[in-house]
Amino acid sequence: MNVNFFVTCIGDALKSRMARDSVLLLEKLGCRVNFPEKQGCCGQPAINSGYIKEAIPGMKNLIAALEDNDDPIISPAGSCTYAVKSYPTYLADEPEWASRAAKVAARMQDLTSFIVNKLGVVDVGASLQGRAVYHPSCSLARKLGVKDEPLTLLKNVRGLELLTFAEQDTCCGFGGTFSVKMAEISGEMVKEKVAHLMEVRPEYLIGADVSCLLNISGRLQREGQKVKVMHIAEVLMSR
């Protein structure tokens, strides 16, 4: 199957291993991965800050970059996936662009959802020894409704003991620009998140949204906690 890969800004600038492992995983599962070279930021930071009008040129650029074919567009970040899926609403005053946005949005899929629901794969042959917790990001679980797919894949990782912890579904406090605008509240939220997950003494924290992982990882480091933080793509490529 041919697919397009939407790398995301964080994947491009900060977490290249996550992006690399996402592509390698797709290729391992038989996909031919195309990288639209003109893709850019989805505009989420501006959108979350209320600068919808200012974000529209970037939205149009991304739409145009992803129109070269009709193949699925795979994203390793729920927040970015949701942002693109919301484009038709933001472009409602421009019918032609709204229509183009809707076609692109319909092709956007989260990495784990694509693997489980489209490829029909629940065991990718991964192996990782240790105790782990999974953080379900708000964008992935609440906005996109992708809840079971990441857990299904993780439960089939050999050697991995998947633990649950108190208030597991609670927001980590990142929320894009929320962590900047409401820094004190955000700080308390991630502090509480870390307190709960550390009660079960995991060796790994796994997530499917890099922004959340960066936020929680920062708190873990400040507390001196020896927990390795991994994107689910990195876990699924572990052997």
Swiss-Prot record:
Give me the Gene Ontology terms describing cellular component: cytosol
| Coiled-coil region | none
Molecular function (Gene Ontology), one example: L-lactate dehydrogenase activity
InterPro entries reported in the protein's UniProt record: Cys_rich_dom
Give the family, as the similarity comment puts it: Belongs to the LutA/YkgE family.
Q: What else is known?
A: The E.coli ykgEFG operon is a clear homolog of the B.subtilis lutABC operon, however it is not able of restoring L-lactate utilization to the B.subtilis mutant for lutABC operon. Thus, ykgEFG operon may contribute to lactate catabolism in E.coli, but under conditions other than those tested, or alternatively, the ykgEFG operon may be responsible for the catabolism of a metabolite other than (but perhaps related to) lactate in E.coli.
Q: Which PANTHER family match?
A: LACTATE UTILIZATION PROTEIN A, UNCHARACTERIZED PROTEIN YKGE
What name appears for this protein in its UniProt entry?
Answer: Uncharacterized protein YkgE
Tell me which species this is from. Escherichia coli (strain K12)
